[in-house]
Amino acid sequence: MKILVAGPLGIGKTTAIRTLSEIPTLHTDEVMTDAAASADDLTLDGLRGKTTTTVAIDFGRLTVPQAKVVLYLYGTPGQRRFLPLWEDIADGAIGALVLADTRRLDQSFEVMDLIEERGLDYAVAVNTFPTSPDYTLDTLRSKLDLDKQTPLVTCDARDKNSTLDALIALTAHLIARAGDESP
């Protein structure tokens, strides 16, 4: 099953896939050029000092033996200029794990809009950083304007158990939605 890992630039998508994958990940991080640095606002909190960016995809795999399921994790670029590639990567996905950062919540709306336009179900995982403001899940749900059915969790993309919990929230949601749509 194909799962998107999406979110804005510098949110932890590559880290999350590397953390979860049981195989060496495919990643297409490249050094940011002056042109890319001027196109992306690297002065925002959480982006200062960023020197690389994903220019195509990240890919990893996670087998869930108990469910006899293999999850193929596809990380999408976080910049609008990669939208055509993003759309190609999204083809065939059954859902998305959207990563968000409380320092830049407004940047998550564009990604959630793209996912909703494609008709994909998703969960939101707020990736925690040392300098991130701390909000309750209810406050985050309100700030992100999420439906009550949309799973919302916090995670640390560097921590396997934490990131796995976020992926479990998404897959449980997808299974429940599939059951709702059964005749």
Question: Positions of the model-derived regions?
Answer:
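A structural signal for isolated positions on well-ordered beta-strands in alpha/beta enzyme cores
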Residues: 4, 123-124, 153
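A short hydrophobic beta-strand->loop->alpha-helix junction that borders the nucleotide-binding pocket
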Residues: 6, 64, 76-77, 103, ...
